[in-house]
Design a protein with these regions (language model features):
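A charge-rich, low-complexity, intrinsically flexible signal that marks solvent-exposed coils, linkers
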Residues: 1-70
Length: 70
């Protein structure tokens, strides 16, 4: 599956799998951006992200993180 910036849920799942135990609220957006564009399935323009998109992905990842803790 090719991932684009709008695929927040899928990106969040990939980040949770790739960085287990990492609290996404402690990750800087610059690091998260780098991790996202490094995903093998990511096929979007790296310059097309913005703070709102990254916040959406961060919150989706945070939900995955909380689910893994319960």
């Amino acid at each position: 599956m090719d991932l684009k910036w709008q695929d927040a849920e899928e990106i969040a799942i990939r980040l949770a799998e790739g960085h287990p135990g990492t609290d996404p609220l402690t990750v800087r957006f610059t690091d998260m951006h780098a991790w996202i564009v490094a995903l093998s399935e990511f096929r979007d323009d790296p310059t097309k992200s913005n703070e709102k998109i990254l916040e959406t992905i961060q919150m989706a990842w945070h939900e995955e993180y909380l689910d893994s803790k319960s």
